[in-house]
Amino acid sequence: LWVWMNNASWVPLHPFSATHITTADIDNNGQDEVIVDFGPGIGIWVFFNNTTWQSLHPLTAGAIATGDLDNNGEADVLVHFPGFGLWVHRNGANWEQLHFLSPELITTGNIDTESEDEVIVDFGPGIGIWIFRNNTAWDGAALLGVSADHLGAADIDGN
């Protein structure tokens, strides 16, 4: 695993290759951490503040996403563990299961007028795309039966 550092040079970050990788400020210090799934037998690790590696979970992920679900400035880590459902690591503290089903795709974004990010998941054909709104409940007005190849969230109309 390599990183392009300070727009100047490639620097090795870890000797293993990643199966999933994302970045987010999960400790609310203004600096992004690198969240890496190194695969079966190694699990998910976080590179904190460009200094130390810390294990986040021993299992490997089907998908990883981040978003500030409670609007406290710390990104929460969402992980689909195949066969175990969708889980969130909140505020660097505890794991909590968000759904017993394992989604095919996960993304986050603030898609309403509230301040926190929503979780948008694709549970696949027959179940569809669902939204976990305002850090409280699954939206029953989801796109039932619809599935996607990719998911994304953005404010395209400026509201």
Model-predicted segments: where are they?
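Trp/Gly-enriched beta-strand/coil motifs that build multi-repeat beta-propeller-like domains
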Residues: 1-159
